[in-house]
Amino acid sequence: MNAALDDKAAKKAAFEGNKLAKRLRHHVGDAINDFNMIEEGDRVMVCLSGGKDSYTLLDILRGLQKSAPINFSIVAVNLDQKQPGFPEHVLPEYLKSIGVEYRIVEEDTYSIVKRLVPEGKTTCSLCSRLRRGILYRVADELGATKIALGHHRDDILHTLFLNMFYGGKMKAMPPKLVSDDGRHMVIRPLAYCREKDIIRYADWKAFPIIPCNLCGSQPNLQRQVVKEMVNDWDKRFPGRVESMFRALQNVVPSHLADPKLFDFVGLQTGDAPFADGDTAFDKEEFRDPAPDADDVEDAPKKRTISILDSRGKESGCGA
């Protein structure tokens, strides 16, 4: 009896895990296609920290690599910043076991950060800048044409609210960007993926997670407050987070207040219809949006399947 129950539970777990993997693959494939993140012949450097996000990113990209209509290579890179207690053996052992090309870069940024940042203050900002410079250098050494980071949809929304609340800017975290010096292309293939899906996926795959608090830095309190706020909205108003993310993809500059984005000064009347006109007076149909279809359907939406299955071989990456 117990054996039968265990077998049934195992089959159910496998079914749910495969469904989750399929959803994440479609979300990643969608983002890659929508933003032209990966092209024929690209060498993608996946930045691997040892956390759930970067493990998931590497795993999903390797799966897409096998079925994509284009050819691209992957090299995983981990920056060992010499934090006390960092388990140096974990990532090399894992990467060898899955047979992926990798490089471990050893740079003692931990000592630099501890020397420059007062005790008790968050070190994340300086640490991030130092890490970014090193990764750009390594990308050059490896001949990488794309640098893939593990930021997901929730990270993008959190950054939007942080900039609004504390920086006075309508600015989020782009799915694709060029570095300040114009020489490196950074991509975020998990841009459409929900953190809660990534957490479940990492647990299902049993990745050897390395804790992110080894440096002893205090967490970014502002980011934590924003994260808790968004998570609360997600629980109380299902579908609202999806709606907020869609807003980032449906910007109407003529109905904001930035004269750098829209020529309010030069606005003139005329006889011809004006596309950016009085839509502000359209009937309001505000309501709580429906939850993400992923929560109520087993399969991805037809739109997603169409994008992944019908694009030409010369473009993008499919599942």
UniProtKB/Swiss-Prot annotation:
Homodimer. Residues 280-290, 310-319 have a biased composition (Basic and acidic residues). InterPro entries: Rossmann-like_a/b/a_fold, TilS/TtcA_N, tRNA_Cyd_32_2_STrfase. It catalyses: cytidine(32) in tRNA + S-sulfanyl-L-cysteinyl-[cysteine desulfurase] + AH2 + ATP = 2-thiocytidine(32) in tRNA + L-cysteinyl-[cysteine desulfurase] + A + AMP + diphosphate + H(+). Its EC number is 2.8.1.-. Its cofactor is Mg(2+); [4Fe-4S] cluster. It is an enzyme of class 2 (transferase). It comes from the Bacteria. Catalyzes the ATP-dependent 2-thiolation of cytidine in position 32 of tRNA, to form 2-thiocytidine (s(2)C32). The sulfur atoms are provided by the cysteine/cysteine desulfurase (IscS) system. Residues 276-319 are annotated as: Disordered. Pathway: tRNA modification. The thiolation reaction likely consists of two steps: a first activation step by ATP to form an adenylated intermediate of the target base of tRNA, and a second nucleophilic substitution step of the sulfur (S) atom supplied by the hydrosulfide attached to the Fe-S cluster. Binds 1 [4Fe-4S] cluster per subunit. The cluster is chelated by three Cys residues, the fourth Fe has a free coordination site that may bind a sulfur atom transferred from the persulfide of IscS. Gene3D superfamilies: HUPs (3.40.50.620). Its main location: cytoplasm. GO terms for biological process: tRNA thio-modification. Keywords: 4Fe-4S, ATP-binding, Cytoplasm, Iron, Iron-sulfur, Magnesium, Metal-binding, Nucleotide-binding, RNA-binding, Transferase, tRNA processing, tRNA-binding. [4Fe-4S] cluster binds at residues 124, 127, 215. One of its GO terms (cellular component) is cytoplasm. A motif (PP-loop motif) lies at residues 49-54. Pfam families: ATP_bind_3. One of its GO terms (molecular function) is sulfurtransferase activity. This is tRNA-cytidine(32) 2-sulfurtransferase.
